[in-house]
């Protein structure tokens, strides 16, 4: 129920309100055995960390957000998420679909979003990829909503057939993109052929809630063919395979390719009542794999008024084996509905900067302010500072504080340094402001560094941040020259013209990764 799906909202759905039984995962699942024994160590570490999240008391469900489709920027959705919630999602998603019609069906596959995924990964996040695959029953165009007849579906695994050749060419195009990510050290939560129990994609059912075993077998064969080709021929050892049917249709496990071909089981859910999915959840976790909500959002009729806090409450109360969720974009997105702050700031939720799977590039703390200002200074202050303060902190009990006068002004907190940061890819600083004063349309801030003998200015994107809430600002250091000679690190704050009075700005927990 996305990609602008015009599927009618169906309420002919049986609600299950039974008490959730206690279901535990086997030792194999807890031991996080990937389907691919040759998976690289980073991928094994990510999977093991995800699989064991339900054993924690807090910070146990990774947040995610769909960023968009290839050949379109994903930056705006990251900006919206951070401005509204003060957090960056732990997982960023892209779909390898190209919306522009191409002359050959395989060219509808595009991995133009890879660089943004690489950047997000280097900044401490995880990535997931879906593919709204074009229809191999056609030579050109996408036709992804046109059902492929079962007889043609069965031809896919015979690469000598017309459909099989097109299928193989599409696999090659996807594999090229996934291989580029592998070469950049990126592990991918790979989610192909999703919502197969629905009737809206070519690989799905032929009618509403229809099930045909022959067609299901064709689906399973196609999945396994893709898996074998990617894993054994293309040597893609960076993939975690995600199987995700839709909650609105039956037969959620009837298309399951098998434990040797799947690593995570998930549900795509655009249901008005997230608490009523117990039956589907129980069926999925009975497959003995880590569980996720691979897509969440409101039904079409509730887009714009849906309360996303219902999802995190439902996860906590009814679906405790959930290891991640992924909110969709556009009118289904948290920032176009209600409850975004509650969703991303719950104590159970893991956001970017909090992911710790034993990666080789953990965050290194440059500055905290538990004892003193550490020689940080500021400018454009008319009301004093900086000092240390316990009024707000991102880590520990103290932060750096300065009092400022609002009204179309800018301010800087900075540290003059002589540092070599050439071995790092990302710099992050957490900020906030006090609750007093009228900030008008909202304050913004960005991280900056000055490098080289000319003190060259380099800055991240401006981001709006809220009072008494933590917002993580960052700058991509891979785009900064002379990192061996960093002269200054700091944050530039701006108050809008329609602000007035006085407030305090804060800064804390300066880290590099």
Curated annotation (Swiss-Prot):
Organism: Caldalkalibacillus mannanilyticus (strain DSM 16130 / CIP 109019 / JCM 10596 / AM-001)
Oxidoreductase keyword on record: no
Gene Ontology MF terms in the entry: mannan endo-1,4-beta-mannosidase activity
Miscellaneous comment: The production of the two beta-mannanases seems not to be caused by proteolytic cleavage.
SUPFAM superfamilies: (Trans)glycosidases, Galactose-binding domain-like
Family per record: Belongs to the glycosyl hydrolase 26 family.
Domain GH26 residues, every copy: 41-353
Residue spans crossing the bilayer: none
Protein origin, superkingdom: Bacteria
Protein name per its UniProtKB record: Mannan endo-1,4-beta-mannosidase A and B
Active site: 195, 295
Residue sites binding substrate per the record: 132, 200, 270, 429-430
Signal peptide: 1-26
